[in-house]
Structures are given as structure tokens and as C-alpha cells.
């Protein structure tokens, strides 16, 4: 069973609630920026160097954004036990066309 199948069973209202909890206080544009960052981060298997290159930002800028997301969400994408929550949020946001 894939994550897409599981998420397809979740009502849109619940998906929006989850996004709101993870990205509390963020504007739609800020959420889009975090989703882009997370998508590239996961595609590069957590490589700060590769992600920063793809985003055309310095590694320190990316680290700052990752730390900012940790402050907002309470989850650190660099920790395997916490990254799952952010991965699910990213997949939901992409499904909702953020």
C-alpha cells in the first residue's frame, strides 16, 4: 500500500488541518516555499549541498530555512523520526496544489 493510497482516503478538510498544524502561522506563499525546499531535500536524500545548489541558495541559507521550519513545526527534517511528519505534510500540500 502506498502513501498516496492512504492519503486519498483522508478528507480534504483533515488534510488542510494537518497543513495548518505543521505550518502554523505561515502564509500560503511561505508554505509553498517550504514545500519546494522539502521536496528537493527529500529528492536529494537529505543532501544539504545538492538541495542548496538546486535552490540556488548558499548552504547556510538552506540551514537557516531548515531551522526556521523546525521552529515553526516542531519537527526537524534532519532527524529520521521527525522527518516523516514533514514528508507527509509535503505530500499533502502537493496533492492540494500548493
Describe the predicted segments one by one.
Residues 1-98:
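Cytosolic nucleotide-utilizing catalytic cores of signal-transduction proteins
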Amino acid at each position: 500500500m502506498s502513501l498516496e493510497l492512504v492519503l486519498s482516503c483522508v478528507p480534504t478538510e483533515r488534510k488542510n488541518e494537518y497543513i495548518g498544524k505543521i505550518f502554523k502561522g505561515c502564509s500560503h506563499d511561505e508554505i509553498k516555499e517550504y514545500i519546494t525546499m522539502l521536496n528537493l531535500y527529500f529528492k536529494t536524500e537529505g543532501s544539504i549541498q545538492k538541495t542548496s545548489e538546486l535552490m540556488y541558495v548558499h548552504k547556510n541559507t538552506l540551514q537557516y530555512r531548515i531551522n526556521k521550519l523546525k521552529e515553526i513545526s516542531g519537527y526537524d527534517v534532519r532527524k529520521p523520526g521527525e522527518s516523516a511528519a514533514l514528508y507527509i505534510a509535503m505530500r499533502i500540500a502537493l496533492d492540494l496544489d500548493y
